[in-house]
A protein has these predicted regions:
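N-terminal active-site segment of His-dependent metallophosphoesterases
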Residues: 1-64, 70-78
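Extended active-site neighborhood of metal-dependent phosphoesterases/phosphodiesterases
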Residues: 63-102
């Protein structure tokens, strides 16, 4: 295993253009890097997926714990899932992307 770093972020809120650019401009890390993401990526599933995919491409291991903004069903989100169904959808998305989540 490549030695790496343990990094942590939260509240990325990528629906804000400045925050989205910050995530898009992250430099690649090493395969041994772990990133802990403590919630509030976005309010729409497509933005959550983009963020997790982008972070996963930069870090060897990504661990994500959803926050209230991630789990809240925004009225303009085309994915109209609420509650447990939304959570399970996000868990399945993480599994597909290779992101660790509870």
């Amino acid at each position: 295993m490549t030695p790496g770093r343990l990094l942590a972020v939260s509240d990325l809120h990528v629906s804000h253009p400045r925050n989205r650019r910050w995530v898009a401009d992250l430099p690649p890390g090493s395969p041994g890097d772990w990133l802990l993401v403590a919630g509030d990526l976005a309010e729409k599933v497509e933005d959550i997926e983009w963020t997790l995919r982008t972070l996963r491409s930069c870090y060897g291991t990504v661990v994500w714990v959803p926050g209230n903004h991630d789990l809240w069903a925004h009225p303009r989100d085309p994915v109209k899932l609420r509650g447990e169904a939304r959570y399970q959808h996000l868990v399945a998305l993480c599994r597909d992307l290779g992101v660790i989540t509870p």
